[in-house]
Curated annotation (Swiss-Prot):
Keywords: Cell cycle, Cell division, Cell inner membrane, Cell membrane, Cell shape, Cell wall biogenesis/degradation, Glycosyltransferase, Membrane, Peptidoglycan synthesis, Transferase. The gene is murG. This is UDP-N-acetylglucosamine--N-acetylmuramyl-(pentapeptide) pyrophosphoryl-undecaprenol N-acetylglucosamine transferase. Pfam families: Glyco_tran_28_C (PF04101), Glyco_transf_28 (PF03033). It is a peripheral membrane protein. GO terms for molecular function: UDP-N-acetyl-D-glucosamine:N-acetylmuramoyl-L-alanyl-D-glutamyl-meso-2,6-diaminopimelyl-D-alanyl-D-alanine-diphosphoundecaprenol 4-beta-N-acetylglucosaminlytransferase activity; undecaprenyldiphospho-muramoylpentapeptide beta-N-acetylglucosaminyltransferase activity. Gene3D superfamilies: Glycogen Phosphorylase B. It is an enzyme of class 2 (transferase). It is found in: Cell inner membrane. Belongs to the glycosyltransferase 28 family. MurG subfamily. One of its GO terms (cellular component) is plasma membrane. One of its GO terms (biological process) is regulation of cell shape. It comes from the Bacteria. It comes from Rickettsia massiliae (strain Mtu5). UDP-N-acetyl-alpha-D-glucosamine binds at T11, G12, G13, N117, R160, S208, Q310.
Length: 376
């Protein structure tokens, strides 16, 4: 049985797509090993079928501290990869992949890199010259060196299986009208619970890097929404830290809004199933999941994201009328409230965005697996 090594870490946005790819490769008969870091250890579940290895590399702004750490990590990675004797190593970008990728190059193991964002990250750009192939999620990608263009294969992003199992209801059957709607999506193998068709559900989450701003900004926006349209029947599903939940619950209760809170949603499919609109960051895995099921979103890109890649992700969708990009530095509760009200009042705009999302949907788990098999 041939072995394949996947390398991803740092955030859930890198981790979960790599796990989804691993599950597809296991179905094809490969033994899949996954090298990740301590930050992603929290996401590892017993039912995941890939074999995990923790190899941590702590970042430091001091080059004299970082280089010794990197050297030690590379030596550990060389030992690990040598014992595995893998056929290929696939890196998903970010600093946690640096040591294993250097080890693969040293051992002459073929490497493939996958860029999930619309902007080629620094680590992936560095390893582009060593890669056999460069898989990308977007048809157009910024920061790509000229020499690397011949290595490009558009595979799309890799979406988790439980998200792929969500079924998109045909546009003609959605029945979305102002004040009356149906669920946009439903689980293939589950019974959809009865619900109030007049209820408009917004799913709010800030990604694996936290949602402090969302707790403050969005609760203020919802207050404005309800002040402007008191008859609106609103349901909020929101990621929020425990210390923020008490305050937000008090606000929503006074507004007679139904709500559900969690610090972290383990099964996003359940929340996607209920939502009519999403408000979120613009990480690559979030965008790919929403694209796959055609669920429209207002994106508030994380301004501190490396190379501002979240802004480029969201702007690309906005330019294709497949979403809305509101920059954190320019946003206000009033602006966000106006956008929410505009979309609730104009369901055809939501339908059009959903259709445009579905136009760029790809079976990334299959296409990337096919590419790996070509390299092997």
């Amino acid at each position: 049985m041939k072995k394949i090594i996947l390398v991803a870490g740092g955030t859930g946005g890198h981790f979960f797509p790599a796990v989804a790819l691993g599950e597809e490769l296991i179905k094809r008969g490969y033994e899949v090993h996954f090298i990740t870091d301590l930050r992603c250890k929290q996401y590892i579940k017993q039912d995941m079928k890939v074999i995990f290895h923790i190899l941590d590399l702590k970042r430091s702004g001091n080059i004299f501290l970082f280089l010794p750490r990197l050297s030690i990590a590379v030596l550990k990675a060389i030992k690990l990869l040598y014992n595995m004797k893998s056929a290929v190593t696939v890196g998903f970008g970010g600093y946690p992949v640096i040591a294993p990728m250097f080890a693969a190059i040293f051992l002459r193991v073929p490497i493939i890199i996958h860029e999930q964002n619309s902007y080629l990250g620094k680590v992936n750009k560095f390893f582009a010259s060593f890669a056999k192939k460069i898989a990308i999620s977007y048809e157009k990608i910024k920061n790509l060196p000229e020499f690397a263009k011949s290595k490009i294969v558009v595979t799309g992003g890799v979406v988790r299986e439980n998200i792929r199992e969500l079924k998109v209801i045909e546009m003609s059957s959605r029945g979305l009208t102002t004040g009356s709607k149906k669920s946009l999506i439903k689980a293939l193998d589950s019974v959809v619970k009865p619900r109030n068709d007049k209820l408009f559900t917004i799913f709010i989450f800030g990604g694996s890097q936290g949602a402090k701003l969302f707790s403050e900004l969005i609760s203020a926006s919802i207050q404005i929404v309800m002040q402007k349209q008191p008859s609106l029947e609103l349901n909020i599903i929101q990621q929020a830290a425990l210390d923020d939940q008490v305050k937000i619950k008090d606000i929503y209760s006074k507004l007679n809004i139904t709500y559900e809170f969690a610090e972290f949603f383990d099964n996003m499919a359940l929340q996607y199933k209920e939502a009519d609109l999403v408000i979120s960051r613009a990480g690559a895995s979030t965008i790919e999941e929403l694209t796959y099921i055609g669920l429209p979103a207002i994106f508030i890109p994380l301004p501190s994201a490396a190379d501002n890649h979240q802004y480029y992700n969201a702007k690309l969708l906005e330019d294709k009328n497949a979403g809305w990009c509101l920059e954190q530095n320019n946003i206000s509760a009033e602006k966000l409230a106006d956008k929410i009200l505009d979309l609730i009042s104009n369901p055809k705009i939501l339908e059009a965005a959903s259709q445009n999302l579905l136009k760029r949907r790809k079976e990334g788990h299959k296409l990337l697996s096919n590419l790996i098999e070509e390299v092997i």
